Amino acid sequence: MNETKKYLVIKAIAQGKKTKKRACVELNLSERQINRPLLAYQQKGKEAFRHGNRNRKPKHAIPDEIKERILKKYLSYETYKPNVLHFCELLAEEEGIKLSDTTVRKILYKKNILSPKSHRKTKKRVRKQAKLNLNQPLDNPILPTAKDFLEDPKKVHPSRPRKKFAGELIQMDASPHAWFGPETTNLHLAIDDASGNILGAYFDKQETLNAYYHVLEQILANHGIPLQMKTDKRTVFTYQASNSKKMEDDSYTQFGYACHQLGILLETTSIPQAKGRVERLNQTLQSRLPIELERNKIHTLEEANTFLLSYIQTFNEQFGNKTKLSVFEEAPNPSERNLILARLAERVVDSGHHIRFQNRCYIPTEQGKEVYFIRKTKALVLKAFDGDIYLNIADKIYHTKELLDHELYSKNFEQEPEQKKERRKYIPPQTHPWKLTSFKQYLHKNKKDYEEFTSEEIHSPQLQV
């Protein structure tokens, strides 16, 4: 009961301004219960209504020394500020202080220190309390009605349950952020909708097809073939196709055909809420991962990608593994995946019996010997996942040999160097999916039509990657 109200009512009784029966109704007490505070008022006055524990520190209260250590530790993070839950984990790991996130949050808020993940409403409330120097939360006297909270039907994106099986739906996205150092890099991610596990992660300078191929390779190697993938429509998968008619520039077709050969249903969406799992994962990692990278002194893309391999396992143990039911299918072997995760380009053989790709010339080879095709023979160039170049001519795949600008040695003035024995390369079978006819059928089905480029039609002096 409010001490002030009780004091004013009892005071009115003592002064003869109010009857005991009226006081019983106002304070919801019996007449006997009214007599006790009335007697105390006559003996002690207003002090009789002061609670005995006021200004007394509880036995379970956190010592001021611990609070100072917590504040000093949080303020020591200069580049990246952790959210409160992550900070509690760091406190337990580095300082041996084990407190709940609610307790730590109250300590920080009392000093007007806000978490980087605080909501706008919380920031406004804390600032208002600091300005008015109040210890109790402020109440808004104007109460809204339920109608004021109804959402516009066009903006409604209701929550949905997770999928039942792991591998039933994979959400993919790239998150640009200053993950380490001042420069912005892109973290490409794939998360399983059912289990909440990160299935693949890869850093690159930009959002690239190569990075998504690395993520897909991690999924295939560690888990298998999923049923469906959902990606952002405004990403590397679509924006290049509108600016170029070159096949190799259409990342969506390249990635889509790889998924088509694996039997993965690829879906794109422009609505962030439609792939909320990966969007929330981006926010979580933007808060946590930069601190872990800084703690481990990670400064390069190579170091960051190596660190991700162990970090994903730790992250999944803490936040994932929500289901063990799986519908992942067995993935192709590494040699087959190397060709499935490839870049494609249409070329024709020129009068020098070679094709030109990315400002370099290549001649098809078979069992180490050069194979010469007639001029204008159509070829499908395959830049494999490991960077090797293959040619598909009449549905037969050939290895290639790069045509150098100058000879490596002079037969007239130098001794011929010893020839290193080449390792036996994987030769795809005739049933391999990268067939020109099947690829053209896929293009036709997706209403794609690309012009063919001869080697003489490419004159850019810069190497395209």
Swiss-Prot record:
The record's annotation in SUPFAM superfamilies points to: Homeodomain-like, Ribonuclease H-like
Give GO terms for biological process. Answer: DNA integration; DNA recombination; transposition
Keyword Iron-sulfur set for record: no
Q: Which residues form a coiled coil?
A: none
Q: What else is known?
A: Found only in encapsulated strains, not involved in capsule production.
UniProt keywords (A-Z) are: DNA recombination, DNA-binding, Transposable element, Transposition
Query: Sorted alphabetically, which InterPro entries does this protein's record hold?
Result: Homeodomain-like_sf, Integrase_cat-core, ISNCY_transpos, RNaseH-like_sf, RNaseH_sf
Q: Where is the Integrase catalytic domain?
A: 157-340
Q: Which organism is it from?
A: Streptococcus pneumoniae
- Top-rank taxon of the source lineage equals Bacteria
GO function term, MF aspect, one:
DNA binding
Write out the function statement from the record.
Required for the transposition of the insertion element.
Name of this chain's protein? Transposase for insertion sequence IS1202
User: Where does the sequence pass through the membrane?
Assistant: none
One matching Pfam family is HTH_29
